[in-house]
Amino acid sequence: MSGLFGIAASALRANQQGLSTVSQNIANVNTEGYARQQLELRTSFGGAGVDVAQVRRNFDAWSESALGEAQSQFGAASARNEALGRLESSFSVGQGSLSAAFGRLQDAFAAVASAPTVRGVRTTVLEEARTVAARFQSLDRQLSSLDSQLSKEIGATAERINTLTAQLAELNQSLRSSGESSSLLDQQNRLISDLSLEVSIRLNRQEDGTVDVLLPSGQALVRGTEARKLESPLGAAGPFAPQLSLEGSPRDPSGSLTGGRLQGLMEARAETLAPLRRDLDRLAVGFAQSMNQAQEAGFTAAGVAGGALFSGVDGAAQASAAPRNSGSATLSVAPEAGAALLASAYELTFDGGANTVTLKRLSDGAEVYAGDPANLGADLIDGLRFSLDDAALLSGGDRFRFDPLAGAAGRITVALSDPEGLAKNRAAVGASVTDGGGATPSDLVLSLPSPQALAAPLPRTGTNAPVLEIVDDGSGTLVLEDEDGGQYAFTLGKPLSLEPYGLELTLSGTAAAGDRITLSFASAGPADGGQAHLLAADRALFSDGATAVDEYASLLGTAAGAANRASLAQEAGALVLSDAQLRREAKAGVNLDEEAADLLRYQQAYQAAARVVSVADTIFQSVLSVVR
């Protein structure tokens, strides 16, 4: 009889545990990180009823890992989409755009060309020029503000990561102290899920239930009960500052990140926002230099050579030296007017053993100079002239970085305050020919189209007019040579283009070595508006042929394209995440239909076990009555 009671009692206990397990599952159906519990039973020894083998968590490492990876990718895509959406909105279209301001300035110059003697239209030019400068400055402020916002968000994300890793380290301590617990493991799962959204991680799960958390680089965020802080010192120490630093590690882990909000924010800042800011600065420099060249090549109504229209974008700047430089040399960089400037930063490295410097363009990693540091400034490099104050002060391993256009869009201003300073008149170019005085007198005749609208001012040596001389090039051929040693082959009676001077001239008659041509220029007259007509033209800013409107359209297209790609990536990431969540739920999630069926099954089994107890009691009472 005791065997029957024992079997029934074990059945009651087992099915009561089943009811408790099902109730726990139902209660936590909406609890984040909860893994469904499942009761496992086994036959008691000797066939004396049933025992509870274990209450098992339905935890599947593969589906959890896939979910974590999907969360990291979605976190990165979501952060990138948010950032680039704000970036796209910074570039306005319509009448308030920079492109529209370019158009209105061109229209104002065209009005001056049509009415060169009317002062009012020249005043409009200055007003529209100030509008262009203001648009540049406004756009620069917006992009700078977004840069600052992203830096703060990166810092805040690093703080959230530190909070989560600290909690995981504390949880590891609890697991070591109290042993594995379903509630602690569920809490661990939730923290890992939250952390995966913020940063890409790798997990090393231990037998005692604790977990080590690593970055993709292998650097540990959590090791046992210790958590290491992640910091973001962006912008704190110039171009050589690390993007990320990890407590106790000399390596910058940012390059190894493959997902998470942290990676998405950093990628949006470094790969889209920073290049766009450089492109905007390049546009500001190119536009200002192009306008200034044309302005300086003309004459004002008073017959004075024109001055710069815009300022704030020219001049040499000093490169940043790496903190560990042991030498004391400084590197200066100056953009060349009208050169093909590239939107890129540069890094110069000195090899003391070979006594050479290597200049690398960081946008594509190309080496643009490698050689003697003393010859660095001999030639233009990407439209820039790099110069060391004293190459002897360099020390092995010294490095310099420089972003030649940085901040130009925010600094551009209108240099002119008086509309009478506008160089609306063309240059009337003149020339005089001096016989070389050789044994055979020459009879050289020169003709010039006059007046001319020059794209750039005539080059001069000091205050002297430029002089060109006919020389023998060494092979018996006469060529025209300028003061810088540039030589131009000519044919008598045919037009000769002197590109550096913006001129075309024709030589005829008899030429002899030693003949000299002295160029001069003066205003074409107060009623002339030819130079204003040139200033109104939509001309190429750089050697690639792009105009100001083209460059702005390219900026707008880049921002819009990046934002669109980020939006599509977020949508795709959401689908992948949803699929990973469904797979995880299929393994570890609570299905209420299944739980309802299990609840009914355990309830019926419990009632049947109770009935067995009742039957056993009836039999026992019958036996007692017989005995009595």
Q: What are the residue ranges of the model-derived segments?
A:
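S/T-rich, low-complexity, solvent-exposed segments of bacterial secretion/appendage proteins
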Residues: 1-628
